From Swiss-Prot:
The keyword ATP-binding applies. Residues 599-614 have a biased composition (Acidic residues). Residues 574-583 have a biased composition (Low complexity). This is Chaperone protein DnaK. It comes from Halalkalibacterium halodurans (strain ATCC BAA-125 / DSM 18197 / FERM 7344 / JCM 9153 / C-125). HAMAP family: DnaK.
Length: 614
């Protein structure tokens, strides 16, 4: 069975992992990093993803960040005259992770388990599945991020324990309470805030820098796009620095200019000031945490371990707040940036059979129901119900001889329908004429293991049935998804073609350089005609490179290669000939010396004693 990869599709960074030799392993990207920035940039029709896109974000306005915050909405990114949905942008990130995994594994990857925040509603989950499909991935399972983290953390734990997973990522916050032991993972409760994450902590620093600079220089940097991008980078770096040190220097020379000349931003930010600026954000995480504890029926003292997930949990004030609430020192044995992807890989291993004896019981984060008379929200499935699940309830008509009923499907916790999230609407028609309250309409909700909802309505009198698989108002039709899949494949082909063209140009440049060097090395040792032929072929290739005509470059490169090969062969032949001549000359010299030795005569001598002479 082919490998199923586990993907943590994050707001700020994404990560991909796979089961290898019974263990979940993070797949590094070609840059050697274990996480990839969830950043997509467009430049002259070319798409850049990850580190390279993040690096040029300052100068390129066509850069998309934190797209996950818009999943399941009607938001569109207008780039170079084309509109992109959040699903399409996310698919570009997924394509990059898919291709990195394929390069690492040496085989095609077509299936994935993708994680989402536990508090994602149905339309956000559906949008994530659609993004996977556009990227050419069959999404085998959608897993809640805290649950995935618990899978990675608890796989080798045999003792029963209750854990609280506190997941503060780049753009979303979740908290889940699970009971685990001996391969059994049961989510007791989950809560969260889809509009809270590390980006918000960056923003309070950015707002502080703008206010301080305006106070000192009277200039509002918030209107300057390039200055804002530099501020964002500096704020993110300062936030990370303050997790390890108590103060950091923010230095942004030439941030802007006015009539008096260039202006520089120089400011020292202390950890205490940062904690003051972000205290309301830390407090916002505690509400859902208390809610999850209440829903699970547990007190803080009954929690055995607190597991921190997401890069933002490195912030000391966050760690202190959760420690004060639970009375437990947070567990530091997992990498908060990688643990979710590792858990997704474990779930993939469960699906392929590589991981055995693991039972995962997740819950639905929000209540589901329909609108009934007077605009009231009537819940059929309460939040924190274990999934998959199915629930039916019988309703009736509100007027005499009512021929049809509109089923308005909602998700949320508010009492009135208008205050909750609409998931979809459908109609059950052809109800036989009858007084109000007589027809019996059975409404059934089904939630699958991905947390995706199906609803059906049935007239028990006629057995007529109507059903709907929820796709949100922002959802994509099958036709739209198919078109986006084709566009994504075409773009992947275009990207591949563009890379091949760049490689061809580089090879051509290298060949021009090699030719010039070869001609110089040959000097006068080659016929003038051959030299001229090589020069002409070289100039032809240079012109093709300047004109940027790929077909001409390819043809001229092949022609020049043949000429250079012939010249190089000559160069080797000459070198061999010279070596032979040198050897031959040495041989002649040796013979001459031997001849001289033949004329030498050995003479006898006798030693004369001076005493004898006397």
């Amino acid at each position: 069975m082919s490998k199923i990869i586990g993907i943590d599709l994050g707001t700020t960074n994404s990560c991909v992992a796979v089961m290898e030799g019974g263990e979940a392993t993070v797949i590094p990207n070609p840059e050697g990093n274990r996480t990839t920035p969830s950043v997509v940039a467009f430049k002259d029709g070319e798409r850049q993803v990850g580190e390279v896109a993040k690096r040029q974000a300052i100068t390129n306005p066509n850069t998309v960040i934190s797209i996950k915050r818009h999943m399941g909405t009607n938001h569109k990114e207008n780039i170079e005259g084309k509109e992109y949905t959040p699903q399409e942008i996310s698919a570009i990130i997924l394509q990059k992770l898919k291709s990195d995994a394929e390069a690492y594994l040496g085989e095609e990857v077509t299936k994935a388990v993708i994680t989402v925040p536990a508090y994602f509603n149905d339309s956000q989950r559906q949008a994530t599945k659609d993004a996977g499909k556009i990227a050419g991935l069959e999404v085998e399972r959608i897993v809640n991020e805290p649950t995935a983290a618990a899978l990675a953390y608890g796989l080798d734990k045999e003792d029963d324990q209750t854990i609280l997973v506190y997941d503060l990522g780049g753009g979303t916050f979740d908290v889940s309470i699970l009971e685990l032991g001996d391969g059994f993972f049961e989510v007791k409760a989950t809560s969260g805030d889809n509009k809270l994450g590390g980006d918000d902590f960056d923003q309070v620093i950015i707002d502080h820098l703008i206010a301080e600079f305006k106070k000192e220089n009277g200039i509002d940097l918030s209107q300057d796009k390039m200055a804002m991008q530099r501020l964002k980078d500096a704020a993110e770096k300062a936030k990370k620095d303050l997790s390890g040190v108590t103060s950091t220097q923010i230095s942004l020379p030439f941030i802007t200019a006015d009539a008096t000349g260039p202006k520089h931003l120089e400011l020292t930010l202390t950890r205490a000031k940062f904690e003051e600026l972000s205290s309301h954000l830390v407090e916002r995480t505690l509400g859902p945490t208390r809610q999850a504890l209440q829903d699970s029926g547990l007190s803080a003292s009954e929690i055995d371990k607190v597991v921190l997930v997401g890069g933002s949990t490195r912030i000391p004030a966050v760690q202190e707040a959760i420690k004060n609430l639970t009375g437990k020192e947070p567990h530091k044995g997992v990498n908060p940036d990688e643990v979710v992807a590792l858990g997704a890989a474990v779930q993939a291993g469960v699906l392929t059979g590589d991981v055995k004896d693991v039972v995962l019981l997740d819950v639905t984060p929000l209540s589901l129901g329909i609108e009934t008379m007077g605009g009231v929200f009537t819940k059929l499935i309460e939040r924190n119900t274990t999934i998959p699940t199915s629930k039916s309830q019988i309703f009736s008509t509100a007027a005499d001889n009512q021929p049809s009923v509109d089923i308005h499907v909602l998700q949320g916790e508010r009492e009135m329908a208008a205050d909750n999230k609409t998931l979809g609407r459908f109609q059950l028609t052809d109800i036989p004429p009858a007084p109000r309250g007589v027809p019996q309409i059975e409404v059934t909700f089904d939630i699958d293991a991905n947390g995706i909802v199906n609803v059906k309505a049935k007239d028990l009198g006629t057995n007529k049935e109507q059903s709907i698989t929820i796709t949100s108002s922002s959802g994509l039709t099958d036709e739209e998804i198919d078109q986006m899949v084709k566009d994504a494949e075409a773009n992947a082909e275009a990207d591949k073609k563009r890379r091949e063209e760049v490689e061809l140009r580089n090879e051509a440049d290298q060949l021009v350089f090699t030719t010039e060097k070869t001609l110089k090395d040959l000097g006068d040792n080659v016929d003038e005609a051959e030299k001229t032929k090589a020069e002409e072929a070289k100039e032809k290739l240079k012109k093709a490179i300047e004109a940027n005509n790929i077909d001409e470059i390819r043809t001229a490169k092949e022609e020049l290669q043949q000429v250079v090969q012939a010249l190089t062969t000559k160069l080797y032949e000459q070198a061999a000939q010279q070596a032979q001549q040198a050897q031959s000359a040495e041989g002649d010299q040796g013979t001459a010396e031997k001849g001289q030795d033949d004329n030498v005569v050995d003479a006898d001598y006798e030693e004369v004693n001076e005493e004898d002479k006397k």
